Amino acid sequence: MAGTARHDREMAIQSKKKLSTATDPIERLRLQCLARGSAGIKGLGRVFRIMDDNNNRTLDFKEFLKGLNDYAVVMEKEEAEELFQRFDRDGSGTIDFNEFLLTLRPPMSRARKEVIMKAFRKLDKTGDGVITIEDLREVYNAKHHPKYQNGEWTEEQVFRKFLDNFDSPYDKDGLVTPEEFMNYYAGVSASIDTDVYFIIMMTTAWKL
């Protein structure tokens, strides 16, 4: 994705800086994820998804804590408890991790969300609600990538690196859900100040 490597570095530095003063548990977790770059929040989502053995999309506190530890999130148990309780609104002892990830995403304008979903729909050729790696390969324009432009990477390397953003090293299922796509671009979005630049970047990369 054109320009995102630089944005990623800047965002990581800014996030680490903000982390030293942030007190809200949600903000602190969000910053820890963003300090890893655009794919940080999506990566945490993958960890939770792998742990969700029975596919009910919920986690109890023990699983939640294990997920944070597996993702090497630095957080006191008390802070994790406070975070968990905020999402366990009905006091059932479980949280819906989709709702949790939704809150964790950096806020985005409607215009940004619309262009992200427009790109998703274009890529989802079969209309079955998931994008396959093959779908991406057909549409993603690698020639806009700065490392391709300066001769550092081949087109194939750009694809591989880009697809790695969507696929977890522990769970390479080759499928990208709307949530994963949105989580990834919420991270990219956090590093880009203006809607106009974000929309131009999406339109160019996905030929919208």
Curated annotation (Swiss-Prot):
Binding-site residues, Ca(2+) 1: 52, 54, 56, 58, 63
Superkingdom of the source species: Eukaryota
Keyword tags: Calcium, Cytoplasm, Metal-binding, Repeat
Cysteine pairs bridged by disulfides in the record: none
Binding residues for Ca(2+) 2: 88, 90, 92, 94, 99
Main location as per UniProt: cytoplasm
Domain EF-hand intervals: 39-74, 75-110, 111-146, 154-191
Residue ranges that the Swiss-Prot or TrEMBL entry lists as coiled coil: none
Cellular component GO terms held in the UniProt record: cytoplasm
One GO MF term attached to the UniProt entry: calcium ion binding
Subcellular location as annotated: Cytoplasm
Protein name: Calcyphosin-like protein
Organism: Mus musculus
Lineage: Eukaryota, Metazoa, Chordata, Craniata, Vertebrata
